[in-house]
Amino acid sequence: MMRLTLKSKVLLLAMVPVLLFALVLSGGAVLILKKQADAEVKDTRERLLGDRRAELEHYVQIAMGSIQAEYDRSANGDLNARAEAIARLSKIKYGKDGYIFGYDSQVVRLFRGDSPVDVGKSFRDRRDPSGVYLNRELVEAGRNGSHYVTYTSPLPGNESVMVPKLSYTLYLPKWDMVIGSAINLDGVEAQLVEIKQDIDERIGTLIASIVGIAGVLLVVLLVIGLAVANAMLRPLHQIRQNLDDIAAGEGDLTRRLPVTSYDELGELAGSFNRFVEKIHGLVRQIAGMTGDLKQLVEQMSAQAERSEQAMERQRHETDQVATAINEMSAAAHEVAQSAQRAAEAAQQTDHEGQAAKRVVDGSIERIHALVDEIRDSGTSLDSLQQDVQSIVSVLGVIRSIAEQTNLLALNAAIEAARAGEAGRGFAVVADEVRALASRTQQSTQEIQGMIDRLQQGTNAAVDAMRRSGEAGEGTSNQANQAGDSLDAIAQLIATINAMNAQIASAAEEQTAVAEEINRSVHQIAGAVDSVADEAQQGAQTARSLAQLGQGLGRLVGQFRI
């Protein structure tokens, strides 16, 4: 498909009607002139043929006039008078080669000018080159009164050339003779050819005039069309230039088209200005929102970085808590073993106390041994009390960590709520961490209650050991009262056995609780790892948003607002 510019279309719109008008006018003029020429040629032909008919009739009438008197005086069938008339008619000549001829009703040639050729010969069955019985028609035209016959005949002196001819015949019934004459019409055709040539020249002159006028009009319309097209296309060129500037990266949205007319082009320029104004406002709003988005993304990125760091610290602290719980579990196990050994020692002491009743003499030494063992038990109980205090300290650390974890999870949930849809997964993880921290606090409180009871039992055991020591000292000084004291010692040993059983049970419970705490801490550590991974993903998402904001800022920066 041919691509034309708008200027070319405007010029074509101006020139094509003129060309069509010139073509239609030329064609109409040519058709009219052709019709007029044909009519003129026809009229001229008829006029010239009429002149030739009149001339030919005049010649024949002159010839008839030369024999009219004899014809009037003669009788029907008077061959002598006819012979005299033939002799007179054969001598008549006119023009360059004009002559008179005669045939009878049987188409027998009676004379042909002064030439004796074929005189007395019948031409009834003779045809011309066109196959027409010419001589019959000549005789028939004279007899029926039509007189005129048009035909073709070889040109005298050049038999190969056929020329049109016109004959006029007149029938003389008394003599049964048709006389007539013929003239060539080639002169008429020559005149007609000249007339046609003259008409063709006039038509050519007229067409040339029309073409010249059309050419002048085309030039004038071309100049006017160029001026109008330039005036029409100037705003369009400005619109295209502004659009090209915006598309090529210039991006100047402050430029406007001047509205210099109130036609469709002026309306187009006004519409373009309104369009650019709307885009200008949109780009300005996008630029402002891009700045706000950039600030929000930077804040979110900083918060994500802080959350990531906080979760890393919490992970480290959780590892420390797990280590402390493992140590506490080992200490509780040692306490249980010590309690078991104390129980065994108490039983042995009981046996020895029973033996002391039977063997008074060896009671002092055994009492001293018992005092030493009681002192060792007191020392072990002191160590147990110190271990319990360590467990209390560790539980305090665990409680503090749980509280800090709860606060961190709360802050993480708040930050996730601020992040909106992107922080929903992080908020779920933060809620799980808070739940785990709450459970840790509850377990810590339960352990604290157990340890309080363990401390009370330990204090009681320490007091009992102290009293046993004092009693042992008294027993060493008062060996005489050994029997009575042995009963008290037996009772005290039973109490010690019960306390040791309680200590062992408490130690076992402490071990179980420590293992439960250890599992909880490991779960917390796993949750913290998940939260840390989510925090890293949130930080990565924040960095991606920051990059998108920067890219959007660069895109908006391409426009001049």
From Swiss-Prot:
Transmembrane segments annotated in the record for this chain: 12-32, 206-226
Which domain of life does this protein belong to?
Answer: Bacteria
- Which parts of the chain does the record assign to the membrane side Periplasmic? 33-205
Q: Where is this region: Disordered?
A: 333-357
Q: Kindly report every residue range on the membrane side named Cytoplasmic.
A: 1-11, 227-561
Which terms in the Gene Ontology molecular function aspect does this entry carry? transmembrane signaling receptor activity
Annotated signal sequence is none
Pinpoint the HAMP domain residues.
230-284
A Pfam family per the record: sCache_2
**Keywords in alphabetical order:** Cell inner membrane, Cell membrane, Chemotaxis, Membrane, Methylation, Transducer, Transmembrane, Transmembrane helix
What topology does it adopt in the membrane?
Multi-pass membrane protein
- What compartments host this protein? Cell inner membrane
The record ties this protein, via InterPro entries, to: Chemotax_Me-accpt_rcpt, HAMP_dom, MCPsignal_dom, sCache_2, T_SNARE_dom
Methyl-accepting transducer domain residues are 289-525
**What are the annotated disulfide bridges?**
none
Which residues fall in a compositionally biased region of kind Low complexity? Answer: 336-348
- Extract one GO cellular component term from the record: plasma membrane
For this entry, list what GO says about its biological process.
Answer: chemotaxis; positive chemotaxis; signal transduction
- What is the deletion mutant like? Mutant shows a dramatic reduction in chemotaxis for all ligands, but it does not affect response to casamino acids. Mutant showed no attraction to malate at any of the concentrations tested. Mutation does not affect plant root colonization.
Similarity-based family: Belongs to the methyl-accepting chemotaxis (MCP) protein family.
Instruction: Give a short account of what the protein does.
Output: Chemotactic-signal transducers respond to changes in the concentration of attractants and repellents in the environment, transduce a signal from the outside to the inside of the cell, and facilitate sensory adaptation through the variation of the level of methylation. Directly recognizes five C4-dicarboxylic acids: L-malic, citramalic, citraconic, bromosuccinic and methylsuccinic acids.
Describe the protein's quaternary organization and the partners it interacts with: Homodimer. The ligand-binding domain (LBD) is dimeric in the presence and the absence of ligands.
Name this polypeptide is given: Methyl-accepting chemotaxis protein CtpM
Q: Species name for this entry? A: Pseudomonas aeruginosa (strain ATCC 15692 / DSM 22644 / CIP 104116 / JCM 14847 / LMG 12228 / 1C / PRS 101 / PAO1)
Organism classification: Bacteria, Pseudomonadati, Pseudomonadota, Gammaproteobacteria, Pseudomonadales
